[in-house]
Amino acid sequence: MSEIIQDLSLEDVLGDRFGRYSKYIIQERALPDVRDGLKPVQRRILYAMYSSGNTHDKNFRKSAKTVGDVIGQYHPHGDSSVYEAMVRLSQDWKLRHVLIEMHGNNGSIDNDPPAAMRYTEAKLSLLAEELLRDINKETVSFIPNYDDTTLEPMVLPSRFPNLLVNGSTGISAGYATDIPPHNLAEVIQATLKYIDNPDITVNQLMKYIKGPDFPTGGIIQGIDGIKKAYESGKGRIIVRSKVEEETLRNGRKQLIITEIPYEVNKSSLVKRIDELRADKKVDGIVEVRDETDRTGLRIAIELKKDVNSESIKNYLYKNSDLQISYNFNMVAISDGRPKLMGIRQIIDSYLNHQIEVVANRTKFELDNAEKRMHIVEGLIKALSILDKVIELIRSSKNKRDAKENLIEVFEFTEEQAEAIVMLQLYRLTNTDIVALEGEHKELEALIKQLRHILDNHDALLNVIKEELNEIKKKFKSERLSLIEAEIEEIKIDKEVMVPSEEVILSMTRHGYIKRTSIRSFNASGVEDIGLKDGDSLLKHQEVNTQDTVLVFTNKGRYLFIPVHKLADIRWKELGQHVSQIVPIEEDEVVINVFNEKDFNTDAFYVFATQNGMIKKSTVPLFKTTRFNKPLIATKVKENDDLISVMRFEKDQLITVITNKGMSLTYNTSELSDTGLRAAGVKSINLKAEDFVVMTEGVSENDTILMATQRGSLKRISFKILQVAKRAQRGITLLKELKKNPHRIVAAHVVTGEHSQYTLYSKSNEEHGLINDIHKSEQYTNGSFIVDTDDFGEVIDMYIS
């Protein structure tokens, strides 16, 4: 035998071979045929069981025997893959109508493996036989099997639209399919309407076929997604569990799950919900129990007293497989090629298949009826000359001679002569001619009817409709999945995710933040806070773990930090720098921090810059879901800094003080609400080389404490301030000196909460009591507190 060697490039060989392989797994493994809704291995399993007589009316047989038949005759692959496919056809949580009945352990909705095939037994279900009905009447084409020892069907007759009824899922080279199961009665009704009106629209079809009907039930949301899928083959719906609420004897409530989304692993779902409880991702769940038994699926989620059960349910919908999205991808083999198909195309392909099946069956039955009628006519003729026929047969040498004599003498056809000689003489003499004439009459009517079906397309369609109606009547069942038109927005109360706890929030001037338990705070006291050298406390207050912290910086940005995300650190220990939580720039400085309990408020923030710009923005604008980077609070122009952020519940007076001692007081009602990216308007009309050092809210009982670079402190009462309009120059608060004039480096509004001040130079600090500073008149420079020759020039002042 001579060898043939081809010189081919590796690129060409790989491309060609992979192309062949891809075509094979697309057509012969992973995708269903649109006509019978089956993949090749499924079709071979059902045909092997049918041809071996393993039908619904017989006893169960070992699954191993069927697997052996399939891999021996039709499917030369591993026995495990065949058995897995066989088991899936028997699982009522995978298929809307099972095609195989199985005795023994056939797996579970917990994804437990089935028992080995040597232990389980199986047979075809009654409905599966409707897929195979009339297969012996030349209804479909057969092809040689893999070793040419027998024949196998290319497709099954499929007397109901199995692709839509049981759906399909699979992945192949470059293609995937996800077709959901549907209600058999609805699918057949839609098919009947399509037969009556081939121009029927998807909207009209959806009056009959409402949407998917999953074997596990559940609630389907999103009519628009269903319609899109039925039109184009692709669409998205939401499938959520059926959850009911029960009240226990102790007054607690529990959520009872009785239906879960399609293809969701129950045990994994229970484990996930329990992990959320154990990890304290959700607050309010006491216990999760799987109470599933022979009566049906049941998962119990016991809740704490007085907890919002609706919010917990919504949290679980969002964070577990209690709710999933299902994506239609209706790809099937049509005319030998994978196609993305809408529901009209699927029904049309199925109907064309049924037209072919019924036509082939009718031709087969017509041929048999005509053959039988020919035989009956011969028998009637023979009975009319019975004595002569008997005499001729007796005088013949053998059966062959008798047959030839009948043809020659009485002009019987070969088929008629064969039928006569095959009858024993006693049967021939006892044959009732009346019965034969009756059969002849029936055959005449049958042939007429069959010819009418073949000659009249409407008659053929009526046969299909009648048979579909019979299947619908015999196998119809109630819809399992409830369909809701709209996809419900999931709203989760913060209380569900975060346990409510009162804690102490602290922020230092150098940007160290922490939350501390009230117990730790009370055990230490304010003075014992953990600080770095040169740092001091900017603010501390009692907040709730369900609150949100807004941290504002000199760059006009803010950090949105849920309190529960802050590390729980003891009061005596150093906190986290905000840059470890949300990255900020090296020269970015924290200027204020606020906590918000509810962003749905009429309160507002006021922002003031060093160069005299100001703006007002309402609190709801600051709510966000982005925690990982700083967000814009206000636009700060180049060579400017944000120096003050205030929060007010309603309009009130604010006072602006500048470095050169100018002061302007006006009402925030003069400011319009603006967006976060706005720069604002002019707050005060600044002199040349002057800048703002303070903008704060003020009231009649307050005083203002100012520090100058020369170590002087000046305290004035509210009555010195003159309420004016925004953007004016204001009044003078310092006595102007020609030599070494005082310049205000810091100023603060003093309320009843404040008792101490701290002065800072580059290397020193000085503490004192605010009440020791007497109130001054307008045109004074205050009292010297420190000697700058020893202390250094004052650069800042804080009050507490």
UniProtKB/Swiss-Prot annotation:
Gene name of this polypeptide: parC
UniProt organism field: Staphylococcus aureus (strain N315)
Alphabetical list of SUPFAM superfamilies matching this protein: GyrA/ParC C-terminal domain-like, Type II DNA topoisomerase
Subcellular location: Cell membrane
Gene Ontology MF, one: ATP binding
Entry GO terms, CC: chromosome; cytoplasm; DNA topoisomerase type II (double strand cut, ATP-hydrolyzing) complex; extrinsic component of plasma membrane
CDD domains: TOP4c (cd00187)
Database matches in SMART domains: TOP4c
Topology with respect to the bilayer: Peripheral membrane protein
Listed name of the protein: DNA topoisomerase 4 subunit A
The enzyme's E.C. designation: 5.6.2.2
InterPro entries: GyrA/parC_rep (IPR006691), Gyrase/topoIV_suA_C (IPR035516), Topo_IIA-like_dom_sf (IPR013760), Topo_IIA_A/C_ab (IPR013758), Topo_IIA_A_a_sf (IPR013757), Topo_IIA_dom_A (IPR002205), TopoIV_A_Gpos (IPR005741), Type_II_DNA_Topoisomerases (IPR050220)
Keywords assigned by UniProt, alphabetized: Cell membrane, DNA-binding, Isomerase, Membrane, Topoisomerase
